[in-house]
A protein has these predicted regions:
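Non-heme di-metal
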Residues: 1-314
Length: 314
Protein backbone atom coordinates (compact mmCIF):
# COMPACT_ATOMS: atom_id res chain seq x y z
CA UNK A 1 0.00 0.00 0.00
CA UNK A 2 1.51 3.35 -1.05
CA UNK A 3 2.27 6.10 1.45
CA UNK A 4 -0.35 8.36 -0.15
CA UNK A 5 -3.05 5.72 0.20
CA UNK A 6 -1.88 4.90 3.73
CA UNK A 7 -2.11 8.56 4.77
CA UNK A 8 -5.58 8.89 3.26
CA UNK A 9 -6.62 5.63 4.88
CA UNK A 10 -5.59 6.85 8.32
CA UNK A 11 -7.52 10.10 7.79
CA UNK A 12 -10.62 8.16 6.78
CA UNK A 13 -10.33 5.81 9.75
CA UNK A 14 -10.18 8.89 12.00
CA UNK A 15 -13.46 10.09 10.46
CA UNK A 16 -15.07 6.73 11.18
CA UNK A 17 -13.74 6.76 14.74
CA UNK A 18 -15.03 10.29 15.43
CA UNK A 19 -18.49 9.05 14.38
CA UNK A 20 -20.01 12.49 13.79
CA UNK A 21 -23.47 10.96 13.21
CA UNK A 22 -23.58 9.03 16.48
CA UNK A 23 -26.64 10.96 17.73
CA UNK A 24 -28.17 11.80 14.36
CA UNK A 25 -30.32 8.74 13.73
CA UNK A 26 -32.79 9.16 16.55
CA UNK A 27 -36.43 10.02 16.19
CA UNK A 28 -36.93 13.27 18.17
CA UNK A 29 -39.39 13.40 21.04
CA UNK A 30 -41.37 16.10 19.22
CA UNK A 31 -41.90 13.73 16.27
CA UNK A 32 -43.66 10.88 18.05
CA UNK A 33 -47.01 11.37 16.34
CA UNK A 34 -48.19 8.97 13.65
CA UNK A 35 -46.69 9.96 10.29
CA UNK A 36 -48.33 7.20 8.27
CA UNK A 37 -51.21 9.43 7.21
CA UNK A 38 -49.92 10.29 3.76
CA UNK A 39 -51.63 10.57 0.40
CA UNK A 40 -53.23 7.24 -0.65
CA UNK A 41 -51.71 7.58 -4.14
CA UNK A 42 -48.17 7.58 -2.79
CA UNK A 43 -48.70 5.34 0.27
CA UNK A 44 -47.84 1.94 -1.26
CA UNK A 45 -44.83 3.19 -3.20
CA UNK A 46 -43.41 5.06 -0.20
CA UNK A 47 -43.82 2.01 2.05
CA UNK A 48 -42.13 -0.08 -0.64
CA UNK A 49 -39.30 2.48 -0.70
CA UNK A 50 -38.88 2.23 3.09
CA UNK A 51 -38.98 -1.57 3.10
CA UNK A 52 -36.47 -1.89 0.26
CA UNK A 53 -34.25 0.66 2.02
CA UNK A 54 -34.26 -1.14 5.37
CA UNK A 55 -33.59 -4.45 3.62
CA UNK A 56 -30.65 -2.93 1.75
CA UNK A 57 -29.20 -1.31 4.88
CA UNK A 58 -29.54 -4.47 6.97
CA UNK A 59 -28.08 -6.60 4.18
CA UNK A 60 -25.08 -4.28 4.16
CA UNK A 61 -24.77 -4.64 7.92
CA UNK A 62 -24.81 -8.45 7.66
CA UNK A 63 -22.27 -8.45 4.81
CA UNK A 64 -19.86 -6.10 6.56
CA UNK A 65 -20.17 -7.90 9.90
CA UNK A 66 -19.49 -11.24 8.20
CA UNK A 67 -16.41 -9.86 6.43
CA UNK A 68 -15.14 -8.37 9.71
CA UNK A 69 -15.49 -11.78 11.33
CA UNK A 70 -13.54 -13.57 8.60
CA UNK A 71 -10.69 -11.21 7.68
CA UNK A 72 -7.34 -11.36 9.46
CA UNK A 73 -6.06 -7.87 8.62
CA UNK A 74 -6.58 -5.39 11.47
CA UNK A 75 -7.25 -2.48 9.09
CA UNK A 76 -10.00 -4.47 7.40
CA UNK A 77 -11.51 -5.53 10.71
CA UNK A 78 -11.77 -1.91 11.84
CA UNK A 79 -13.20 -0.70 8.54
CA UNK A 80 -15.91 -3.33 8.21
CA UNK A 81 -16.78 -2.96 11.88
CA UNK A 82 -17.36 0.77 11.41
CA UNK A 83 -19.44 0.25 8.28
CA UNK A 84 -21.55 -2.50 9.88
CA UNK A 85 -22.21 -0.07 12.75
CA UNK A 86 -23.43 2.62 10.34
CA UNK A 87 -25.65 0.28 8.30
CA UNK A 88 -27.21 -1.16 11.46
CA UNK A 89 -27.93 2.36 12.68
CA UNK A 90 -29.60 3.28 9.37
CA UNK A 91 -31.76 0.15 9.38
CA UNK A 92 -32.83 0.76 12.97
CA UNK A 93 -33.77 4.33 12.15
CA UNK A 94 -35.99 3.32 9.22
CA UNK A 95 -37.62 0.75 11.47
CA UNK A 96 -38.59 3.51 13.93
CA UNK A 97 -40.68 5.14 11.20
CA UNK A 98 -42.08 1.89 9.80
CA UNK A 99 -43.78 1.29 13.15
CA UNK A 100 -46.15 4.15 12.27
CA UNK A 101 -47.38 2.02 9.38
CA UNK A 102 -47.82 -1.04 11.65
CA UNK A 103 -45.17 -2.78 9.58
CA UNK A 104 -42.59 -5.07 11.09
CA UNK A 105 -40.01 -6.28 8.60
CA UNK A 106 -38.65 -9.71 9.52
CA UNK A 107 -35.02 -9.59 8.43
CA UNK A 108 -33.97 -12.62 10.46
CA UNK A 109 -33.67 -14.69 7.28
CA UNK A 110 -30.60 -12.62 6.40
CA UNK A 111 -28.75 -13.78 9.51
CA UNK A 112 -29.83 -17.42 9.72
CA UNK A 113 -27.22 -20.08 9.03
CA UNK A 114 -27.09 -20.83 5.36
CA UNK A 115 -24.75 -22.06 2.69
CA UNK A 116 -22.52 -19.15 1.73
CA UNK A 117 -21.60 -18.20 -1.81
CA UNK A 118 -18.06 -16.89 -1.89
CA UNK A 119 -17.13 -14.10 -4.28
CA UNK A 120 -13.71 -12.78 -5.12
CA UNK A 121 -13.02 -9.62 -3.08
CA UNK A 122 -12.82 -7.52 -6.24
CA UNK A 123 -16.48 -8.22 -7.05
CA UNK A 124 -17.50 -7.09 -3.57
CA UNK A 125 -15.37 -3.96 -3.98
CA UNK A 126 -16.88 -3.00 -7.36
CA UNK A 127 -20.46 -3.69 -6.32
CA UNK A 128 -20.39 -2.14 -2.86
CA UNK A 129 -18.42 0.92 -3.98
CA UNK A 130 -21.12 1.63 -6.54
CA UNK A 131 -23.93 0.80 -4.13
CA UNK A 132 -22.60 3.27 -1.56
CA UNK A 133 -21.84 6.05 -4.05
CA UNK A 134 -25.13 5.76 -5.92
CA UNK A 135 -26.86 5.67 -2.53
CA UNK A 136 -25.22 9.02 -1.77
CA UNK A 137 -26.31 10.44 -5.13
CA UNK A 138 -29.90 9.25 -4.65
CA UNK A 139 -30.29 10.62 -1.12
CA UNK A 140 -28.62 13.97 -1.81
CA UNK A 141 -30.73 14.52 -4.94
CA UNK A 142 -33.95 13.96 -2.98
CA UNK A 143 -32.68 16.06 -0.08
CA UNK A 144 -31.83 19.01 -2.34
CA UNK A 145 -35.28 18.81 -3.91
CA UNK A 146 -37.16 18.98 -0.59
CA UNK A 147 -34.67 21.55 0.74
CA UNK A 148 -35.55 23.78 -2.21
CA UNK A 149 -39.27 22.95 -2.01
CA UNK A 150 -40.16 22.26 1.67
CA UNK A 151 -43.82 21.86 0.77
CA UNK A 152 -42.91 18.58 -0.99
CA UNK A 153 -41.54 17.01 2.19
CA UNK A 154 -44.52 14.77 2.93
CA UNK A 155 -42.62 12.74 5.54
CA UNK A 156 -40.02 13.79 8.16
CA UNK A 157 -37.49 11.10 7.20
CA UNK A 158 -36.28 13.27 4.32
CA UNK A 159 -34.81 15.69 6.90
CA UNK A 160 -32.15 13.08 7.74
CA UNK A 161 -31.02 12.42 4.17
CA UNK A 162 -28.13 14.92 4.04
CA UNK A 163 -26.07 13.45 6.90
CA UNK A 164 -27.31 9.98 6.02
CA UNK A 165 -25.89 10.19 2.52
CA UNK A 166 -22.56 11.37 3.92
CA UNK A 167 -22.25 7.99 5.67
CA UNK A 168 -22.81 6.30 2.31
CA UNK A 169 -20.23 8.57 0.71
CA UNK A 170 -17.63 7.75 3.37
CA UNK A 171 -18.17 4.02 2.88
CA UNK A 172 -17.60 4.47 -0.84
CA UNK A 173 -14.36 6.35 -0.13
CA UNK A 174 -13.09 3.34 1.81
CA UNK A 175 -13.67 1.04 -1.16
CA UNK A 176 -12.03 3.58 -3.47
CA UNK A 177 -8.93 3.48 -1.27
CA UNK A 178 -8.93 -0.32 -1.28
CA UNK A 179 -9.10 -0.44 -5.06
CA UNK A 180 -6.52 2.30 -5.60
CA UNK A 181 -4.14 0.41 -3.31
CA UNK A 182 -4.15 -2.52 -5.77
CA UNK A 183 -3.77 -1.30 -9.40
CA UNK A 184 -4.35 -4.81 -10.74
CA UNK A 185 -8.05 -4.42 -9.86
CA UNK A 186 -8.32 -1.52 -12.30
CA UNK A 187 -6.82 -2.86 -15.51
CA UNK A 188 -6.92 -5.68 -18.02
CA UNK A 189 -9.97 -7.95 -18.04
CA UNK A 190 -11.17 -6.27 -14.85
CA UNK A 191 -12.22 -3.26 -16.93
CA UNK A 192 -15.00 -5.43 -18.35
CA UNK A 193 -16.13 -6.36 -14.85
CA UNK A 194 -16.15 -2.69 -13.84
CA UNK A 195 -18.28 -1.85 -16.86
CA UNK A 196 -20.63 -4.74 -16.09
CA UNK A 197 -21.18 -3.63 -12.49
CA UNK A 198 -21.68 0.00 -13.54
CA UNK A 199 -24.32 -1.04 -16.03
CA UNK A 200 -26.01 -3.56 -13.71
CA UNK A 201 -26.33 -0.99 -10.90
CA UNK A 202 -27.57 1.80 -13.19
CA UNK A 203 -30.03 -0.44 -15.06
CA UNK A 204 -31.45 -1.92 -11.85
CA UNK A 205 -32.06 1.54 -10.43
CA UNK A 206 -33.70 2.78 -13.63
CA UNK A 207 -36.10 -0.17 -13.84
CA UNK A 208 -36.99 -0.01 -10.14
CA UNK A 209 -37.57 3.76 -10.05
CA UNK A 210 -39.92 3.63 -13.03
CA UNK A 211 -42.12 1.29 -11.00
CA UNK A 212 -42.66 4.13 -8.48
CA UNK A 213 -44.22 6.91 -10.58
CA UNK A 214 -46.45 8.32 -7.82
CA UNK A 215 -43.61 8.62 -5.30
CA UNK A 216 -41.58 10.66 -7.78
CA UNK A 217 -44.63 12.70 -8.73
CA UNK A 218 -45.19 13.60 -5.06
CA UNK A 219 -41.61 14.93 -4.98
CA UNK A 220 -42.13 16.66 -8.35
CA UNK A 221 -39.35 14.59 -9.84
CA UNK A 222 -39.43 12.89 -13.21
CA UNK A 223 -38.11 9.34 -12.65
CA UNK A 224 -36.06 9.59 -15.84
CA UNK A 225 -34.59 13.02 -15.08
CA UNK A 226 -33.93 12.04 -11.47
CA UNK A 227 -32.16 8.85 -12.51
CA UNK A 228 -30.03 10.63 -15.10
CA UNK A 229 -29.04 13.21 -12.48
CA UNK A 230 -28.06 10.41 -10.10
CA UNK A 231 -26.08 8.71 -12.89
CA UNK A 232 -24.25 11.98 -13.63
CA UNK A 233 -23.27 12.45 -9.97
CA UNK A 234 -22.20 8.81 -9.61
CA UNK A 235 -20.21 8.93 -12.85
CA UNK A 236 -18.42 12.11 -11.76
CA UNK A 237 -17.53 10.55 -8.39
CA UNK A 238 -16.43 7.28 -10.04
CA UNK A 239 -13.69 9.12 -11.91
CA UNK A 240 -11.65 8.80 -8.71
CA UNK A 241 -11.24 5.06 -9.18
CA UNK A 242 -12.67 3.62 -12.41
CA UNK A 243 -10.55 3.87 -15.61
CA UNK A 244 -13.66 3.07 -17.67
CA UNK A 245 -17.04 4.80 -17.45
CA UNK A 246 -20.42 4.52 -19.15
CA UNK A 247 -21.21 7.14 -21.77
CA UNK A 248 -24.49 8.18 -20.18
CA UNK A 249 -24.82 11.20 -22.50
CA UNK A 250 -25.00 8.97 -25.56
CA UNK A 251 -28.71 9.11 -26.64
CA UNK A 252 -28.69 5.35 -27.15
CA UNK A 253 -27.90 4.83 -23.47
CA UNK A 254 -31.19 6.32 -22.28
CA UNK A 255 -33.06 4.84 -25.25
CA UNK A 256 -31.99 1.32 -24.30
CA UNK A 257 -32.64 1.88 -20.59
CA UNK A 258 -36.21 2.90 -21.43
CA UNK A 259 -36.60 -0.21 -23.54
CA UNK A 260 -35.21 -2.33 -20.70
CA UNK A 261 -37.75 -0.80 -18.32
CA UNK A 262 -40.59 -1.36 -20.80
CA UNK A 263 -39.64 -5.01 -21.37
CA UNK A 264 -39.38 -5.61 -17.62
CA UNK A 265 -42.88 -4.15 -17.15
CA UNK A 266 -44.17 -6.45 -19.89
CA UNK A 267 -42.54 -9.41 -18.17
CA UNK A 268 -44.17 -8.56 -14.84
CA UNK A 269 -47.57 -8.13 -16.49
CA UNK A 270 -47.26 -11.57 -18.07
CA UNK A 271 -47.61 -13.10 -14.58
CA UNK A 272 -45.88 -16.12 -13.10
CA UNK A 273 -48.16 -18.77 -14.54
CA UNK A 274 -46.59 -20.63 -17.38
CA UNK A 275 -43.17 -19.38 -16.36
CA UNK A 276 -41.64 -21.03 -19.42
CA UNK A 277 -44.30 -19.79 -21.82
CA UNK A 278 -43.20 -18.65 -25.27
CA UNK A 279 -44.13 -15.04 -24.48
CA UNK A 280 -42.01 -14.95 -21.31
CA UNK A 281 -39.08 -16.65 -23.00
CA UNK A 282 -39.22 -14.10 -25.82
CA UNK A 283 -39.26 -11.27 -23.28
CA UNK A 284 -36.27 -12.76 -21.44
CA UNK A 285 -34.35 -12.94 -24.72
CA UNK A 286 -35.26 -9.34 -25.58
CA UNK A 287 -34.12 -8.19 -22.13
CA UNK A 288 -30.82 -10.00 -22.61
CA UNK A 289 -30.32 -8.46 -26.05
CA UNK A 290 -31.11 -4.99 -24.72
CA UNK A 291 -28.65 -5.34 -21.82
CA UNK A 292 -26.00 -6.66 -24.22
CA UNK A 293 -26.49 -3.63 -26.48
CA UNK A 294 -25.93 -1.37 -23.50
CA UNK A 295 -22.83 -3.31 -22.47
CA UNK A 296 -21.22 -3.10 -25.89
CA UNK A 297 -21.77 0.63 -26.29
CA UNK A 298 -18.47 2.50 -26.51
CA UNK A 299 -17.12 3.34 -23.06
CA UNK A 300 -15.39 6.48 -21.88
CA UNK A 301 -11.72 6.19 -20.96
CA UNK A 302 -10.85 7.94 -17.71
CA UNK A 303 -7.33 8.85 -16.60
CA UNK A 304 -7.17 8.25 -12.87
CA UNK A 305 -6.20 11.33 -10.83
CA UNK A 306 -3.28 11.25 -8.41
CA UNK A 307 -5.30 13.09 -5.78
CA UNK A 308 -8.34 10.84 -5.82
CA UNK A 309 -10.23 11.60 -2.62
CA UNK A 310 -13.58 13.28 -3.32
CA UNK A 311 -15.65 15.46 -1.02
CA UNK A 312 -19.47 15.16 -0.85
CA UNK A 313 -20.12 18.56 -2.42
CA UNK A 314 -23.34 17.98 -4.35
Amino acid sequence: ISMTVREEWDKLMSEFEIDSNVDHFQRPKDMQENYSKISPEVYDEFVDFLISSITSEFSGCVLYAEIKKRVKNDDMKKLFGYMARDESRHAGFINQWLKDFNIGVDLSFLTKAKKYTFFKPKFIFYATYLSEKIGYARYISIYRQVEKHPELRFHPIFLWFEKWCNDEFRHGEAFALLMRSDPSLLKGANLLWIKFFLLAVFATMFVRDHKRPMLHKALKLSPTEYDMQVFEITTEISKQVFPVLLDIKNPNFLKNLKKLSYLNAQLEQSGTKGIFSIRRLVLFVKLGVCFTRLFFMKSLVNKLPEDFRVKPSW
